[in-house]
Every structure is written in structure tokens, then in C-alpha cells.
Amino acid sequence: MINSRSLDDLVPPAKQRAQAFVEAAKAKGIDLLVTSTYRDNESQAALYAQGRTTPGDVVTKAKPGQSWHNWRCALDVVALVNGKPVWSTKDPIWQKIGEIGKSCGLEWAGDWKDFKEFPHFQYTGGLTIAQLQQGAKIA
């Protein structure tokens, strides 16, 4: 199972935006910890099972092959305040993080209507997962 935390494992256009995002957050006094970038299908299957067939809360709606992490186009982050992660989505820091990520050309899953994922940011290059599955490449 692979669940990378390295920005180097993202496709170049996503990596560039992710690096700019982390740097822009730092410039505004927000330290971000990258918790996930590339995730293989086995890791995605384990996450998808969580809250369904294994203990825990549901944390994703994406089955293996249907996550932008599987395509090296997404990252999950959390802010560190005094060295501790801020997971509560009620904390106003998440809105700041979301705005910074969007200003760097990333889509923020905190804006999604049906299943908000505050730590999740992605770069799609205007493509869909179906297009990637058919061989399209992110530019």
C-alpha cells in the first residue's frame, strides 16, 4: 500500500500549485502538514472501506481509481498550531487555508456541496476522472 506525503509524487502541474500553496500559507503564518498526496488503489480501497466495512467514520466517497489522489493530482493538508494539528473544521483557520489554496489554482473540497473534505485540495486541469481513465493527461 502506498500513501505518499511527498509533493514530488504529484504530476508537475499539481506539484507546482501545491508547492505555491504550502509556501503562500507559510508566508501568512500558517504551517501546513501534508498528510497525503499520491495514493495507490489498495490504499484508496482501505480508506473507502472505513466506516462501511471497517471501523471508523466515512472519510471518502471515492472508490479505488476514482480519487484524484490515485491520479497524483491531489493533496490533503492540516494546519499545525503550536505543533499540533487542527482537525476541527469549525476552526476559522480552515477558511483561510481554503482561500490560500484556491488562490494558488487548486480546487478546495471544503467548497463542495454534498461531501465537504476540508483537508483536500486538487488540480484537475479541467479534466474528469473518466477522461484520465481513457488516457487523457493533465497539462
Indicate where each model-derived feature is located.
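Short loop/turn and capping residues at structural boundaries
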Residues: 36, 58, 111-113
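Soluble non-cytosolic domains of exported or imported proteins
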Residues: 4, 8-16, 38-41, 88-95
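Active-site acidic/histidine clusters and adjacent loop/turn architecture
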Residues: 1-33
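Catalytic cores and adjacent binding grooves of peptidoglycan-active enzymes
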Residues: 62-139
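Glycine-rich, flexible loop/turn motifs
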Residues: 3, 34, 43, 64, ...
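Extended, low-complexity, intrinsically disordered C-terminal regulatory tails
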Residues: 22-55
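Short Pro/Gly-enriched beta-strand edge/turn motifs at strand-loop
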Residues: 55-61
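Charged/polar, solvent-exposed surface patches and flexible loops
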Residues: 12, 16, 23, 46-50, ...
